[in-house]
Amino acid sequence: TARQLIASVGGTVTPYGVVYDNGMRLEQVYDGQFFPCYYYEPHATMVAVTPKSEPENTEHITWLYLPMAQEEIDRVLQRSGIADSADARLRLEHSQLPDEVNALLDMEHESLADLNALAQATNNFSTDDIKKLGAAVTLAKPQNAEQVKNLAENLDLFDFAPDAHSQAEYGKYMIQQSGHYEFDENLDEFYDYEGYAQQRINDEDGMFTDRGYIAYKGYFSLEEIMEGGQGGSMEMGGMV
């Protein structure tokens, strides 16, 4: 504490006050070419970029905080000596994306352009949106960042009941919380939650996931949506 420092260390009197040596040693971390890693945007997708011509454990790391303008990416890479993004090795260091997405990204085959587009598509996602995207990924099984981006841009084509892991929980969510019905708690014991959910499940393209129940309500197939097909829905609205 300040009192302990004053009591144990002799200070140097200056015209501006008394200066005490607290033992802190400053270290230069910027070498004039590669900036150190630092978190300045909580929702940024952080990608470590190194030249393929150098060992994987090289200390010459360029940090990108996606999404970024393409001109900015090009400028940062050029400053680091990488003239072509194809010559760059990528590593995902941090992201706000759900674990389901992080697990499927193969950084050896992903491009900076696709990762940047995905970061842009999810940049303003809320916590609920992130959970819904994780469930949608489990249902649709995309293979790369571009397909995940296309799912993210069409999340309104999915109905999502968060934390519903059984037919009864799904039915209860629909009747009590979805806003589709006027729920009367005095009649709670008379609702057939499980039966109602079973009827919906039979008519839907959905599944239970670790995050809840999710169903796809679009007109085009999931494969077409993930390949960038025109989004469209046969039903208006959704639960989430």
Language-model features and meaning:
Residues 45-55:
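A short beta-strand micro-motif
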Residues 166, 197-199:
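Extended, charge-rich alpha-helical segments
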